[in-house]
Amino acid sequence: MKPTRIVLFSAVLSGMIAFVAPTKNVARDVNIKSGNGTILKGTYFAAAKPGPGVLLFHQSNRTRKSWEDVARQLVAVGINALTVETDPNKTRKQRWPADLNAAFEFLISQPGANREVVGIGGAGVIGVEDSVETARGHSAEVKSLVLLSGETESLDFLRQASQLPELFVAADDDEYPPIVEAMELLYVTASSPSRKFVHYSASHEAPWLWYEPFDIGKVPAKGGHGTDMFKGHPELPGIIVDWFVTTLIKTPGHAPADTVASASVINQIQMPGGVAQVTQQLIEARRKDPEAQLFPEITASTIGQDHMRAGEPKSAVEVLKLVLLAYPESADANETLAEAYLPDGQKELARQHAEKALALLDSHRLPASSWTDTEQYRGEIRRGAEKILKQLTPGS
């Protein structure tokens, strides 16, 4: 049995995010005419070749320029970007839906912009509201959301968008409390198992002084709100770019399932009858989306391995069969299930899955698992599979 693998991922470790050098001479200022006659100021950043697009809304006390660094990094990795200027003095009824639709339609109408794969990012109360409302109005095209330091009344949309990848970011030193709690509400209301929360902690939250959208300048900026976080946390733009690369280029509309986001499913797996229930949920989810995932491979695999360590091979097999159903091309999942079949007396199945693990490793067609593909870990899987086959060889 392989030792327990505990991996802690921190979204705030800059070493995990590759820095993307900004690209020069890709931006042009544009005027976008809204359906209500309003002229929206914007800046369009064109990628060198066709690719997805990202629409970025700024917070009320900043301008579209606050997103420029992110936009340039997006262009460098092949993603078109549009930053748009919104009027913080306008009410939602005045902005929605005409201004939002105009910005969205401008983005997807640009040469080289994939109109079917779009991401949206927003900062502050107004930016987050505009982002969620735009995603609601264009749910078929919007494949990813990034929300910084805001809130929205559209909680029902986040609850219903069960497969929309969402990245939430907030900081305790945000000068407009209770933004952290508002962002946490958005996160716990959202139902996507691939959603993530980047939370910059402090010993105390900032004191409440005034509301964000009103009387701009009354509250001194402290660097903890919206795109202001980029200065104090220089890795954050890279985290956002990496998120859009994953959800718009590598696996459009999908991100790896997150343990915290899928906590209810993980807990359900550990309850009596839970494996069968989650198995059915996964089958139903796959009917709608063949790429749907309800839980991370390594987290559920650890539950199965815990059963093995407790001398409960039948329970281990039950859980690990679910893991393999979710991740059928994982050499790791095949080898771990083979380890469980062996003490359960199912020798032929143990042989089959050990051989499948080796075949997957030898093909070099896919990563060894969904969570890691290092040569060291591939070696661990290989040694485990070969050990099982040796144990099954007569006379060994």
Question: What label would you give each PLM region?
Answer:
Residues 162, 167-170:
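Short beta-strand/loop motif that positions the catalytic acidic residue
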Residues 105-163:
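Primarily recognizes the serine-hydrolase "nucleophile elbow" in alpha/beta-hydrolase
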Residues 49-51, 58-62:
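Active-site glycine-rich loops that stabilize anionic/oxyanionic intermediates
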Residues 60-71, 86:
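The serine-hydrolase catalytic nucleophile loop
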